[in-house]
């Protein structure tokens, strides 16, 4: 998504989270999945977390930088549509496995993906199933300073904070799609997707005044 001209993404703990279209705020753009509007997982904003949907589940990304007349008029910035994997024209299978290690959290990371699709009954019935699992412990640390101006007009440091963040994100996603070709001009389609995400975050702060 970030490689598209006019699109910027906001990061959280090294992962892309929000998409901005044409420099507007993320809450001024709509995010849909297969054309269906996604609500925000946060109660006090319209921002939609793009990292809720794993990349293994997405086939294409459609971006409209201008809302057209056939779209909901609730997005000044534009629209981002995530298209999930559809049934293939022939049998296909793919599996991915990855791991890593985060030195700050001192924990291992795991990423698994599975996709299978095929057609049955003389290619009239198509099926696609996709499963994704990710467990990604991470961490970050920094030092933050606060300055003020004293009575002499001098800029002085009034506070220093040493912060550490330990984050574990676990994602589980399941996608299932069917289609049935009634004739060359008509097709029935059934799609479903289930996503589950957990975030655990520990914050530590030491303040010097």
Model-derived segments and spans:
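Extracytoplasmic beta-strand/coil segments of soluble accessory domains associated
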Residues: 1-37, 65
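Short acidic/polar hinge/loop motifs at secondary-structure boundaries
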Residues: 9, 19, 36-66
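N-terminal periplasmic accessory domains that precede
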Residues: 17-22, 32, 48-51, 63, ...
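Residue-level detector of the transmembrane beta-barrel scaffold of outer-membrane proteins
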Residues: 30-32, 60, 92-96, 126-128, ...
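Flexible, solvent-exposed coil segments and beta strand-coil junctions
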Residues: 42, 58, 89-97, 150-159, ...
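Outer-membrane beta-barrel pore domains and translocons
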Residues: 64-66, 83, 96-102, 132-134, ...
């Amino acid at each position: 998504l970030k490689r598209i001209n006019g699109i910027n993404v906001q990061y959280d703990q090294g992962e892309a989270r929000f998409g901005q279209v044409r420099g507007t705020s993320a809450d001024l753009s709509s995010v849909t999945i297969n054309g269906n509007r996604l609500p925000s997982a946060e109660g006090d904003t319209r921002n939609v977390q793009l990292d809720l949907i794993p990349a293994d589940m997405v086939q294409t990304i459609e971006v409209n930088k201008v809302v057209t007349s056939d779209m909901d008029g609730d997005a000044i910035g534009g629209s981002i549509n995530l298209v999930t994997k559809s049934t293939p024209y022939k049998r296909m299978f793919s599996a991915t496995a990855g791991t890593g290690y985060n030195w700050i959290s001192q924990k291992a990371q795991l990423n698994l993906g599975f996709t299978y699709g095929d057609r049955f009954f003389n290619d009239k019935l198509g099926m696609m199933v996709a499963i994704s699992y990710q467990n990604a412990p991470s961490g970050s640390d920094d030092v933050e300073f606060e300055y003020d101006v004293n009575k002499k007009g001098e800029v002085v440091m009034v506070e220093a904070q040493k912060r550490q963040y330990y984050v574990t994100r676990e994602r589980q996603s399941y996608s299932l799609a069917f289609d049935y070709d009634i004739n060359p001009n008509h097709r029935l389609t059934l799609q479903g997707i289930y996503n589950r995400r957990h975030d655990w975050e520990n914050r530590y702060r030491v303040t010097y005044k």
